């Protein structure tokens, strides 16, 4: 992480990539990036293409941005701008998009950043084995959780770094670096060149503390760690916004007391405001709730009679 440097990249990727290729054996200097935007904004390949004389295939699905991308490299015949949305199945998989170009099967660098189906697109790549793969993960998901967003082009959720590590191992890659939002993976035959003794997520982690959740005996939910809407840069007080029980029910009287009044109030709230389930830890059901209502009516009648 000491090699972070930005020429066009967002979080020091340019410097990290430069150092990685200082250690990797010399290749054919080919790179692939999607979504490429205009070829400059937050680009992980612009420095290689503009300053290092690399060749590249840049893929951008947005029809408005593709003109800017073509304009950026209009005087560079070694860059091939493509207007396509990369898919994980069907005709527009990455293997098919790359096949018309003179790009080696083991080209040097693949950058994947589409804010969603990154996992499924890398998984679908079969013919090509780039030396280095940079891929965006959802940094709000803790490093010990495996989460893969559904394979759906209409969704933009992202997947966890652990999911990418597991996928990488299946495909013959090893993690060598993590920055704020990207994982860097090299083909396993080059891993020893980096002298990394421990490439676990915990050892390489350099991103903000992810959100953790736990609950207290009275039903209070506690949220610890980064509390903001990820892409909206909006702070959120989750300890106030995401409580299952209202404050008046988070009281020892409702937890421990055998008082019928307190238990009646809780069951009424549970019946009308909490999601119904077939059973709960104490065996309460909707039928039991109505049974408590009848019992409480009887209790009130007896009090009145007294």
Each model region followed by its residue ranges:
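N-terminal start-of-chain detector that recognizes signal peptides
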Residues: 2-5, 28-31, 105-108, 155-159
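Short, charged low-complexity linear motifs
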Residues: 28-34, 169-174, 276
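Hydrophobic transmembrane signal anchors and adjacent membrane-proximal interface regions, especially
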Residues: 2, 23, 229-231, 254, ...
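SAM cofactor-binding core of SAM-dependent methyltransferases
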Residues: 3-100, 112, 139-142, 217-219, ...
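Generic secondary-structure transition motif, activating predominantly at the C-termini of alpha-helices
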Residues: 21, 25, 73, 77, ...
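Conserved acidic-Pro-Pro-aromatic motif
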Residues: 46-47, 54-55, 106-112, 116-256, ...
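C-terminal non-catalytic accessory extensions
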Residues: 268-306
């Amino acid at each position: 992480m000491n090699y972070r440097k930005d020429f066009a990249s967002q979080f020091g990727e340019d410097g990290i990539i430069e150092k990685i290729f200082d250690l990797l054996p010399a290749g054919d200097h080919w790179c692939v990036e999607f979504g490429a935007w205009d070829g400059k904004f937050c680009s992980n390949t612009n420095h290689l293409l503009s300053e290092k004389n690399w060749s590249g295939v840049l893929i951008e699905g947005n029809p408005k941005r593709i003109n800017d991308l073509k304009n950026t490299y209009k005087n560079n015949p070694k860059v091939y701008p493509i207007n396509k949305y990369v898919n994980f199945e069907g005709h527009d998989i990455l293997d098919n998009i790359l096949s018309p170009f003179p790009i080696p099967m083991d080209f040097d660098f693949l950058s994947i950043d589409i804010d969603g189906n990154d996992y499924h697109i890398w998984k679908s790549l079969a013919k090509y084995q780039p030396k280095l793969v940079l891929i965006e993960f959802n940094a709000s998901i803790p490093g010990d959780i495996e989460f893969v967003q559904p394979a759906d082009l209409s969704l933009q959720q992202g997947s966890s770094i652990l999911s990418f590590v597991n996928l990488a191992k299946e495909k013959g890659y090893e993690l060598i670096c993590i920055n704020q939002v990207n994982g860097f993976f090299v083909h396993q035959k080059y891993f020893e060149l980096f002298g990394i003794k421990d490439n676990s997520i915990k050892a390489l982690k350099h991103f903000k503390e992810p959100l953790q959740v736990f609950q207290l005996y009275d039903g209070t939910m506690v949220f610890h760690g980064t509390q903001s809407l990820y892409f909206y840069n909006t702070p959120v007080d989750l300890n106030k916004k995401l409580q299952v029980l209202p404050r008046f029910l988070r009281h020892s009287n409702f937890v421990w007391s055998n008082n019928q009044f307190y238990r009646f109030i809780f069951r009424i709230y549970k019946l009308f405001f909490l999601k119904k389930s077939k059973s709960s830890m104490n065996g309460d059901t909707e039928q039991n709730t109505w049974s408590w209502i009848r019992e409480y009516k009887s209790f009130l009648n007896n009090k009145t009679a007294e």
